[in-house]
């Protein structure tokens, strides 16, 4: 197994720096998930059908490159470690691709628009993969202490919630301010700013973190063997299913949210007010993961409870709107975000622990490969959610920058509340069966330190 070069404790500056990594990730990917679809349809002038097809096609692309990148990170050997160098190299390239993706050319032909969209989006996804997979895997390489990992992921989630809050609050006004009367220019200038933040945050994460868990060279293994090992890792498979559902609910709703406020509520500026109301609950909810985990001693069950409560609150939002009941609407939005933030912290805290379980179960350790499939699962969920939304809006007559028909309005409303609410409850049911608790995990780590494993006894 990997040997830890210290007592498992991680310096505070490293936890903060790791959190800044997810700040950077959100200034790229949350900007993309919340704004790229409406940018394509309402600014670039691309059809809903083309956007829907892109979302599905890009997941086939992910199915190829995610496992490859994950495997390559595990095989990387430098004086800076396995995973940190990827942040240094891939982050600036991805920042450039982010800017290119938000560079609209509305006067081009439809064919030229679609070709440009496909090329820039697929390259952006690849660039983000080259940053996000090693970044996510890095947590497990920083320590094997389950409580320290919980603290690291809490730092990650709190930082992410702050970043998401800032993005949601300032993006719409920034687009308007920087673009003056041109949304095209506004999106481009915002992408330049966010791209610089993305790169800077990952440089800081690279500089202030350290890989403490040293993986022996002999543990290089083929993709076929790694896939077989993954299929024997039951906690990981449950987490993977949870990530697919998570991607569907989060990104499908995020893609809908600006449409919802623009066309259902009638004013895109409500999105800024909504974002201001959820930022504090987001931060508090993320910080509440640790006390709930200490009570339950099971990260999967902790995620399950947060998911269930998120779903219930989101279902309740269907019955309220900004115009008629603003207090109830915004209060429920804050409650929903509080529970979601707790879930977001828990679901990512699960993954590193599954690596040790897999090593104990099969004798193989493959941190990057496992995180690659988590990333792929999340993106598959995202693809289904966004592609389905785009397909339904296109089928029922969505017309950009015009008043929408009742069917389109109904789709936007349900995509904002009832559909993700139901899926959160399904997610809660799946993760309830996660049984790798703190006691069992610590026993597994001790076995591994002594050279024992389930595979040795088989």
Regions inferred by a protein language model and the residue ranges of each:
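Membrane-embedded alpha-helical bundles of multi-pass transporters/translocases
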Residues: 2-458
